[in-house]
From Swiss-Prot:
Gene name for this UniProt entry: xkdA
InterPro entries cross-referenced by the UniProt entry: IrrE_HExxH
Family: To B.subtilis YqaB.
UniProt protein name: Phage-like element PBSX protein XkdA
Length: 198
């Protein structure tokens, strides 16, 4: 799947690479913030990103668990890295788009695909969730959603690979020769293999 990383997955991988982080054990929220010149504040209020006088701060709710703070940090970090302008002065649809993007970024930043690919996850889903939650220090609910995203992505890539295989193994002149039966058999075989791997 490494050759099939999405733009966001590649962006996150490159960001971690620039920070010198290659495994989950090297992830340290406060060190990441320091390396990116972001101040982190723990307050009794909702999490948010603040830009003042050219400096970025991320405010995290001090009453939340470490796991929830890490998840919120991932969300707010997207606003720092990818979004410009005053969030509150934007129209509703644009704000919703930015929130959607920040949520997608959060899942991929807190539990990066390139790191998941390096792991041998347990076969049982409950154990896989517990492993992801423990290794990446996220909540079980977060791990559940992230594993769903990861599995759907893998299934989509398997589909792409099988489809590419099907298209590359068709006889070039089958239509001209009227060999419809050959094409139908090849398509059925490919669809069978796709179904087996999804």
């Amino acid at each position: 799947m490494g050759d099939y990383l999405s733009h966001l997955e590649e962006y996150v991988k490159n960001l971690y690479g620039r920070l010198g982080i290659t495994s989950p054990h090297h992830i340290d929220m406060l060190k990441i913030a320091k390396d990116l010149d972001i101040w982190v504040h723990f307050e009794d209020m909702g999490s948010m990103m603040v830009k003042y006088d050219g400096m970025y701060s991320i405010v995290l709710n001090q009453k939340k668990s470490r796991e929830e703070q890490w998840e919120d940090f991932g969300h707010e970090l997207c606003h720092v890295l990818k979004h410009a302008g005053n969030h509150f002065q934007m129209n509703k649809l644009f704000r919703e788009l930015q929130e959607f993007q920040a949520n997608q970024f959060m899942y991929h930043f807190c539990v990066p695909t390139f790191m998941l690919l390096q792991m041998e996850l347990p076969q049982w889903r409950s154990q896989a969730l517990a492993t992801i939650a423990a290794v990446f220090r996220v909540t079980k609910e977060f791990a559940d959603k992230r594993l769903d995203m990861f599995e759907r992505r893998k299934a989509g890539i398997q589909f792409q690979k099988r489809l590419a295989y099907l298209l590359s193994h068709k006889r070039p002149n089958a239509y001209e020769e009227g060999d419809q039966q050959h094409l139908q058999v090849a398509e059925e075989k490919a669809l069978y293999h796709i179904g087996k791997n999804i």
